[in-house]
A protein has these predicted regions:
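Hydrophobic membrane-insertion alpha-helices, especially the h-region
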Residues: 6-21
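Positively charged n-region of N-terminal signal peptides that target proteins for export
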Residues: 1-4
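A well-ordered secondary-structure block
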Residues: 118-171, 268-330
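Short, well-ordered surface patches within globular domains
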Residues: 211-270, 314-318
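A cross-family detector of function-defining hotspots
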Residues: 25-111, 138-186, 191, 313-328
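Solvent-exposed, polar/charged alpha-helical surfaces in well-ordered, non-transmembrane soluble domains
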Residues: 72, 76, 137, 141, ...
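Second-shell loop/turn segments in exported
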Residues: 58-64, 122-130, 204-214, 228-238, ...
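Intrinsically disordered, low-complexity
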Residues: 170-237
Length: 330
C-alpha cells in the first residue's frame, strides 16, 4: 500500500502493499487463529497488568503518563523508548509501546520533563472522565468551548477544523481528535505545553533531512498503532517501498503538484513496477497541508478511502517518503 502524506511542511508518501504469495489455506487459517489468540491475550494483559488510573495532578493521562512528569518516572513505568525521532518543535518524540504496538504513546521532553504527549489508543484517562470513544458533544460539555485561534508572533492561526478541538488551560494545549466515521467520538489526544508550543515560531517546523526522516518513521508507527487499536496485524517497514514513495514526494514538492499520477502519467502501480516491486494489491494515500505526522495521520483516518487503505487487512508492507516544498510544506 502506498501512502503519500504531504504536509504543508513536507510531502509525505506512504506505500502499503500485499506482496505476491502462493495461496496456502492452512497457513492462512493458522494465522487467523494466532491473531484471534493474540487479540484476546492482549486484552487480558492490558486489563491485568496496565491498570489505568484517573490522573490526580493533570487533566489527562495516557497509560498513566502525565504532563510534567520526569523522564525517569516515565521510564520507570514504560521502560526505554522503542524509537526516538525529531519533531517540528525542535525537540524529540520518544515512542513507547509494549510488544507489538500495544499501549502506544509518544512523549516529548524539555529539561527531562514531559512537555508533550500523544496517543491514538484506548489508554486515555482524565479527571473529567473523557476517554477513547467519548462523544464530541460530551468533550465540549466537560472541557468548555474550544480555542478559535492560536497566535504566533503577529500572526493568528484559526482553529476551525471540525475533525478536532483545541483546548487551552493551565498552560497546556489539548487537541482532541474525533473519528467522523464513528459518530465523532474521541480517537486520539495530543497535549503540548505552552513552553513546547512557543518553540515553534511559525506554523511549520524548519525543514531538514532529519525531520523528513523522522516524519517517515513516525507515520509508520502511527499506522501500526492504529491497526493494533483496530485489532489488525501490524505492517513491516520496506526501504524499497519507501524509496519509491520518497521519489514521488520529491517530485511533487519540486514540481508543485499533488496527485497520485505523476507528470509522466505514471500511476502509483506503474511506479512500483518500474522500481521492481511485485505485489498482489497496493494502495496509496496522499495528504497535504498538515503541520506534523500526527495531524497528517489523523486527517487520513477521517478520509474514507485513505482510512480503508490504513485498515486494509490484506496489506503486509509499508513504505513512507517525505519531502518539503519551497514554502516549508511537507
Amino acid at each position: 500500500m502506498k501512502k503519500f502524506i504531504v504536509t504543508v511542511v513536507a510531502f509525505l508518501s506512504i506505500i502499503i502493499i500485499a506482496p505476491i504469495t502462493e495461496f496456502k489455506p492452512f497457513i492462512h487459517l493458522q494465522n487467523e487463529v494466532r491473531q484471534y489468540i493474540d487479540i484476546h491475550i492482549n486484552k487480558e494483559t492490558i486489563s491485568a497488568e496496565n491498570k489505568l488510573d484517573t490522573p490526580k495532578k493533570q487533566q489527562f493521562a495516557f497509560n498513566n503518563i502525565q504532563m510534567n512528569m520526569s523522564k525517569s518516572d516515565v521510564e520507570k513505568t514504560l521502560n526505554k523508548p522503542k524509537r526516538v525521532t525529531f519533531n517540528e518543535y525542535g525537540t524529540k518524540w520518544y515512542t513507547y509501546y509494549d510488544g507489538d504496538y500495544n499501549n502506544f504513546i509518544m512523549v516529548s521532553y524539555i529539561k527531562d520533563k514531559v512537555n508533550a504527549l500523544y496517543t491514538n489508543q484506548n489508554i486515555i484517562t482524565s479527571k473529567s472522565k473523557i476517554k477513547y470513544n467519548t462523544p464530541k458533544s460530551v468533550v465540549r460539555q466537560r472541557l468548555g468551548e474550544p480555542e478559535t485561534e492560536i497566535v504566533k508572533g503577529r500572526v493568528r492561526y484559526e482553529q476551525n477544523n471540525k475533525e478536532y478541538d483545541v483546548f487551552h488551560k493551565n498552560h497546556i494545549y489539548t487537541t482532541v481528535f474525533y473519528d467522523k466515521h464513528r459518530r465523532n467520538n474521541v480517537t486520539a489526544v495530543l497535549q503540548v505545553s505552552d513552553a513546547m508550543e512557543n518553540r515553534l515560531k511559525e506554523q511549520y517546523g524548519a525543514p531538514s533531512k532529519s525531520l523528513a526522516d523522522s516524519f517517515e518513521l513516525q507515520n509508520f508507527d502511527l499506522v501500526n498503532a492504529e491497526r493494533k487499536q483496530h485489532q489488525l496485524s501490524t505492517l513491516k517497514y520496506s526501504k524499497q517501498n519507501s524509496e519509491t514513495a520518497r521519489k514521488h514526494s520529491k517530485d511533487m514538492a519540486k514540481n508543485h503538484y499533488f496527485d497520485h499520477t505523476n507528470l509522466k502519467g505514471q500511476s502509483p502501480f506503474d511506479r512500483l513496477k518500474k522500481d521492481g516491486i511485485t505485489f498482489n494489491s497496493a494502495g496509496e494515500n496522499l495528504a497535504y497541508g498538515q503541520v506534523s505526522s500526527i495531524y497528517a495521520h489523523q486527517g487520513l483516518m477521517n478520509s474514507i478511502g485513505h482510512r480503508k487503505n490504513i485498515l486494509n487487512d490484506t496489506f503486509k508492507i509499508l513504505g513512507v517518503g517525505v519531502d518539503f516544498n519551497d514554502e516549508k510544506q511537507p
